[in-house]
Design a protein with these regions (language model features):
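Basic, Lys/Arg- and aromatic-enriched nucleic-acid-binding interface segment
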Residues: 1-44, 48-49, 58, 68-71, ...
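Catalytic-site neighborhood detector that most strongly recognizes the C-terminal catalytic loop/helix
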Residues: 5, 13, 66-70, 105, ...
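DNA/chromatin major-groove-contacting recognition/catalytic segments
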Residues: 17-21, 73-79, 83, 87, ...
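C-terminal catalytic core of Y-nucleophile DNA break-rejoin enzymes
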Residues: 23, 67-87, 95-120, 136-137, ...
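C-terminal catalytic core of tyrosine-transesterase DNA break-rejoin enzymes
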Residues: 31-35, 39-46, 145-172, 179
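Short, polar N-cap/turn motifs at the start of nucleic acid-interacting alpha helices
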Residues: 54-61, 138-141, 160-179, 190, ...
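C-terminal secondary-structure termini that scaffold catalytic or DNA-interacting sites
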Residues: 87, 91-93, 101-105, 131, ...
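Short helix/loop segment immediately N-terminal to the Walker
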Residues: 126-141
Length: 201
């Protein structure tokens, strides 16, 4: 079971070596999906519906709209993520999804992407860190959403300022997004580059 926000149980995270294990174990579009989540801090549904029109390879940025808040988020490309996107770039239809096969699939439910991710975790030999929740329910501390927490933790471990971490994980309003400056973009790019590389994929 996914970890409900109201449970009060701390969400788990993945260290870089574990993220690499996930990417190496995953197949097809899942490899890029995991990298998108880890290097942008985006939620599962947002990662699946990112479009090529939001990818700026020259500017090394990726822009998407959060389904939960409606906020537009612009994040910087990590070198690992940029390398993989460069390999896939070249479409003349920028409105299409980066992950067209996964974009049409459900995220929740027994056959949803969240459960599929758990299978990848088990195949990679990683612990879901299952704990007892309210009542008799058993819940997992490490799910796909833990990649979002891992992103912010990785930035914090590299002493990236909290305000920059907040920008990278999403603004609260469109007005905040419009306050972006070139200087801030450079700061965001420098912050993301501090996350350790996953090595060859």
């Amino acid at each position: 079971m996914e970890l409900p926000e109201a449970e009060g149980v701390e969400r788990g995270t993945f260290i870089p070596a574990e993220v690499k294990m996930l990417v190496d174990t995953a197949e097809g579009e899942w490899k890029l999906l995991i990298m998108l989540a880890y290097f942008t801090g985006a939620r599962l549904s947002d990662c699946c519906r990112m479009q090529w029109e939001g990818v700026d390879l020259a500017g090394e940025t990726l822009t998407y709209t959060q389904a939960k808040t409606g906020a537009k988020v612009t994040g910087a490309h990590h070198p690992d993520l940029m390398a993989r996107l460069n390999k896939l770039a070249g479409t003349d239809k920028p409105e299409i999804f980066i992950l067209p096969q996964l974009a049409s699939q459900r995220t929740s439910g027994r056959r949803g992407l969240s459960e599929a991710f758990k299978k990848i975790m088990r195949k990679a030999g990683l612990d879901l860190q299952t704990v007892k929740g309210a009542g008799k329910r058993m819940i997992s501390r490490r799910t796909f959403h833990a990649l979002r927490h891992s992103f912010t933790s990785a930035l914090a471990n590299q002493n990236v300022a909290s305000e920059l971490r907040m920008k990278l994980t999403g603004h609260k309003t469109e007005r905040e997004h419009q306050k972006y400056t070139h200087h801030e973009s450079n700061n965001l790019r420098a912050a993301v580059r501090k996350i350790p590389s996953l090595g060859s994929k």
